[in-house]
Swiss-Prot record:
Keywords: Developmental protein, Differentiation, Growth factor, Heparin-binding, Mitogen, Proto-oncogene, Secreted, Signal
One of the GO biological process terms: signal transduction
Organism in which the protein naturally occurs: Homo sapiens
Domain of life according to the entry: Eukaryota
Subunit note: Interacts with FGFR1, FGFR2, FGFR3 and FGFR4. Affinity between fibroblast growth factors (FGFs) and their receptors is increased by heparan sulfate glycosaminoglycans that function as coreceptors.
InterPro entries: Fibroblast_GF_fam, IL1/FGF
GO cellular component: cytoplasm; extracellular region; extracellular space
Entry similarity comment: Belongs to the heparin-binding growth factors family.
Protein name: Fibroblast growth factor 4
Keyword Transport recorded: no
Gene from which the chain derives: FGF4
Amino acid sequence: MSGPGTAAVALLPAVLLALLAPWAGRGGAAAPTAPNGTLEAELERRWESLVALSLARLPVAAQPKEAAVQSGAGDYLLGIKRLRRLYCNVGIGFHLQALPDGRIGGAHADTRDSLLELSPVERGVVSIFGVASRFFVAMSSKGKLYGSPFFTDECTFKEILLPNNYNAYESYKYPGMFIALSKNGKTKKGNRVSPTMKVTHFLPRL
């Protein structure tokens, strides 16, 4: 039995034709396309190709279910991606960064490696992707942060808004473990910190 999601997918071609119809017959002019030279467009293409490759490597049981994708609950590719720097106000203040060698750390200044793309995986859960390094921020079962070249379930974090308007990022796979930076800008093990500690508080900045 087909549901609302199936009907919406079936109507998509008709909607696209209706949107393109006003451009037909104008001296053969092609329909306008979105600019391909923007940073956002390039990141979108790279990110989607990475995730598609990563999902292909996952076991079938770990891949998003068709029903979840149709309902929008698991289709994070359709969500809003945010380019941000995650600032932790400890020590002299540090931005979380994903380095080209796969390490995760902190940098006081705005660096190319501290520009991150936060993408929704499902409601309240995000992935954190290093724009320059092309590594996902991931956390192991021992609470160690590392850079993953592919998207896995260790790359998912629950984004929690705190009373001070900072965010805490809790491992979705390993609840109770949080992303944290020390006063020296080094990563701290996620199983040795809590959201009451300042080292886990991050402010998303442009």
